[in-house]
Regions:
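N-terminal auxiliary segments of SAM/dcSAM-dependent transferases
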Residues: 2-84
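Class I SAM-dependent methyltransferase SAM/SAH-binding core
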Residues: 130-186
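A short SAM/SAH-binding and catalytic strip from SAM-dependent methyltransferases
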Residues: 196-208
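A short glycine-rich, Lys/Arg-flanked "PGG" loop and its adjoining helix->strand segment in the class I
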Residues: 210-222
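Short alpha-helix
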Residues: 253-268
Length: 293
């Protein structure tokens, strides 16, 4: 007799497979950007002949070549993903790890996850439609902003986190949150698709922030809002100490000043940069500029 967890996993996989096949037009080949079609093997590109499998209800656009990646995060996560360690981390990420990190870097000025999610939701205003959640983890923010009028599609490189997120979605009865495994630098979506985008907690780990933001920008509609939570060099909070910033850099992170972030955001095609700090935790908004003709 199948265990309760096995039944849940099967239900998640079946419902997501059905949604992927019915959603049509959302996904595009991350390599050649042409539309993908559902097939018996997953999602197929008729132009470059690539096939992307669907693993437990989650399309996998990343593949298995982790060792040769120039992205340190992909090498680390890819080689350890779906092991006992990452499965455990995924199960406690939202209740223990994430709040601890925000409290540590926020210091006396730290904001709760509830407050940060509220800030992100405010940036999106009352906008509905499709929302892109970049480096979504277990849908920490996406699940909190999803609604009857908002469908959230989260991308991450860690399958364990997204499988945990799919379990949360099932348990919390949130029908409008979906996941895909992909890199921010090569998003598997057609251009001008999303009504808004969010990225909470991972901007500091992107190898090339401008490249990542440009790719996010590509997938958004003109005038669409962007909401980001990251860590920054600010006069309050732990990041004001050089030793802490150096340690973050050695671990693959990049700590920017608010001015540096604004410059990169504008360079990537956004405008109207507006920051708000909680210690070294920064929430900022921006908006995609008008389409060039």
């Amino acid at each position: 007799m199948a265990s309760h967890s096995a039944v849940i996993e099967s239900t998640i996989s079946q419902s997501e497979d059905e949604w992927i096949r019915q959603s049509g037009g959302f996904y595009a080949c991350p390599t050649c950007k042409h539309d993908l079609e559902p097939s018996n093997d997953g999602l197929s590109c008729s132009v470059c002949a690539r096939i992307y499998p669907i693993l437990g209800g989650i399309p996998d656009f990343l593949g298995g070549n982790f060792a040769g990646s120039g992205n340190r995060s992909i090498r680390v996560v890819g080689n350890w993903d779906s092991g006992i360690l990452f499965d455990f981390m995924a199960s406690v990420y939202e209740t223990c790890i994430y709040p601890a990190v925000c409290n540590l870097y926020g210091g006396w000025h730290s904001a709760s996850l509830k407050q940060l999610a509220h800030d992100v939701s405010d940036i999106l205003e009352s906008r509905g439609g499709l929302i892109l959640d970049v480096a979504c983890g277990p849908g920490t923010y996406g699940r909190r902003i999803a609604s009857a009028s908002r469908t959230v599609i989260g991308i991450d490189i860690c399958l364990s986190m997204m499988h945990q997120g799919a379990r949360y979605v099932q348990r919390e009865h949130i029908p409008n949150v979906h996941f895909a495994r992909a890199m921010v630098e090569e998003l598997p979506f057609r251009s001008g698709l999303f009504d808004a985008a969010i990225c909470a907690g991972s901007l500091n780990h992107f190898t090339d922030v401008v490249l990542a933001l440009r790719e996010i920008n590509r997938t958004m509609k003109a005038g669409a809002p962007l909401a980001v939570m990251c860590f920054a060099l600010i006069d309050s909070g732990l990041m004001k100490y050089k030793s802490i910033r150096d340690r973050a850099e050695r671990g693959g992170g990049h700590i920017y000043s608010v001015a540096d972030l604004e410059r990169r955001v504008i360079e990537a095609g956004f405008e109207d940069f507006r920051p708000h700090a909680y210690g070294s935790v920064l929430v900022f908004s921006a908006r995609k500029g008008p389409e060039e003709h």
